[in-house]
Amino acid sequence: AQNYLGAVDSLARIERFYPFGDYAEQARADLIYAYYMSGDYDQAYAASEKFIRLYPRNTNVDYAYFMKGMTGYYADEGLLGNIFSLSLSKRDITGAMQSYADLTEFLIRYPESEYIDAARERLIFLRNLIASSELDGAEYYLKRGAYLAALNRANYVLKNIPNSTEKQRALDIMKKSFIELGYEEYAEKVSSVEALN
């Protein structure tokens, strides 16, 4: 990280002293990566946005969009999560949701980019993380007796994140919620859906 901090300083100086021209343009692209590697994800995100705004027709603008999506998740990972080893799904997932949206935009804009495979891989991870977080909330509601709220959360995951690894967990929560609400016939329908999977 130390070398990248030095790189950030050098690249920022190039940008400051030579704000126009090819060197500044390349320095701004390199600055995104240097911030990212030094762990300054907020600055990497901001540098990505700045590059996109200043150079929308640059041949490497796909890289800026890609890095924007990659940094959003890390920006809110937080020190407390690292110290207390919180489950990823129990942390604030605002950044993960923003990262998902940014990477989805990247996929739509640049389907032929060299970064497409890495973006897809990260999207799968984020999709499962978001689904898991939603279902952690649903399980919290189950424990508190808020069965309708739990049912809504599980239903949200099944409707909006259908390809997640959390599908079975969502169905289990729906089944428990229906039983607790006295709707055994709906619980049986959920069981028949489970049998199809």
Q: What are these model-derived regions, one by one?
A:
Residues 1-197:
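Acidic, polar-rich low-complexity tracts and alpha-helical solenoid repeat scaffolds
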